[in-house]
């Protein structure tokens, strides 16, 4: 009977020590939950970056393979035109009176858009 008490006491002490390590020791449950949250956050960040990389890779492939993408980018970002094309810039007429004077002035004809052709050889 005495041996059972010692065995029970040793098992209780062992259980208490294991519980202490589980809740408060290194690698405890709080740290594990915090690390799992960090992993989830990093996984979301990685997925966004993976999608961005795929889009950039598709753009690089398109620029390497097709002239249409290069031409479109040259036209929109650099303002380039093909030989023999005529570029038209539409400039709207600016009002001659300041805004306060416009309210007091009689209504004028609506401003007409003018087109200035620019020829490039």
Swiss-Prot record:
<keyword id="KW-1003">Cell membrane</keyword>
<keyword id="KW-0472">Membrane</keyword>
<keyword id="KW-1133">Transmembrane helix</keyword>
<dbReference type="GO" id="GO:0043093">
    <property type="term" value="P:FtsZ-dependent cytokinesis"/>
</dbReference>
<feature type="coiled-coil region">
    <location>
        <begin position="31"/>
        <end position="66"/>
    </location>
</feature>
<keyword id="KW-0812">Transmembrane</keyword>
<keyword id="KW-0997">Cell inner membrane</keyword>
<dbReference type="GO" id="GO:0032153">
    <property type="term" value="C:cell division site"/>
</dbReference>
<comment type="subunit">
    <text>Part of a complex composed of FtsB, FtsL and FtsQ.</text>
</comment>
<dbReference type="InterPro" id="IPR023081">
    <property type="entry name" value="Cell_div_FtsB"/>
</dbReference>
<comment type="similarity">
    <text>Belongs to the FtsB family.</text>
</comment>
<feature type="transmembrane region" description="Helical">
    <location>
        <begin position="7"/>
        <end position="24"/>
    </location>
</feature>
<dbReference type="GO" id="GO:0005886">
    <property type="term" value="C:plasma membrane"/>
</dbReference>
<keyword id="KW-0175">Coiled coil</keyword>
<keyword id="KW-0132">Cell division</keyword>
<feature type="topological domain" description="Cytoplasmic">
    <location>
        <begin position="1"/>
        <end position="6"/>
    </location>
</feature>
<feature type="region of interest" description="Disordered">
    <location>
        <begin position="98"/>
        <end position="121"/>
    </location>
</feature>
<protein>
    <recommendedName>
        <fullName>Cell division protein FtsB</fullName>
    </recommendedName>
</protein>
<dbReference type="GO" id="GO:0030428">
    <property type="term" value="C:cell septum"/>
</dbReference>
<dbReference type="InterPro" id="IPR007060">
    <property type="entry name" value="FtsL/DivIC"/>
</dbReference>
<comment type="function">
    <text>Essential cell division protein. May link together the upstream cell division proteins, which are predominantly cytoplasmic, with the downstream cell division proteins, which are predominantly periplasmic.</text>
</comment>
<dbReference type="Pfam" id="PF04977">
    <property type="entry name" value="DivIC"/>
</dbReference>
<keyword id="KW-0131">Cell cycle</keyword>
<feature type="topological domain" description="Periplasmic">
    <location>
        <begin position="25"/>
        <end position="121"/>
    </location>
</feature>
């Amino acid at each position: 009977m005495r041996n059972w008490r010692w065995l029970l006491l040793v098992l209780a002490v062992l259980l208490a020590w294991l519980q202490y390590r589980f809740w408060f020791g290194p690698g405890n449950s709080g740290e594990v939950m915090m690390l799992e949250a960090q992993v989830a956050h990093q996984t979301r960040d990685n997925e966004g970056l993976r999608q961005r990389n795929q889009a950039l890779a598709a753009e690089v492939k398109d620029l390497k393979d097709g002239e249409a993408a290069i031409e479109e980018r040259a036209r929109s970002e650099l303002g380039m035109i093909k030989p023999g094309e005529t570029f038209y810039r539409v400039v709207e007429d600016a009002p001659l009176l300041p805004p306060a004077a416009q309210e007091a002035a009689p209504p004028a004809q609506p401003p007409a858009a003018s087109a200035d052709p620019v020829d490039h050889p």
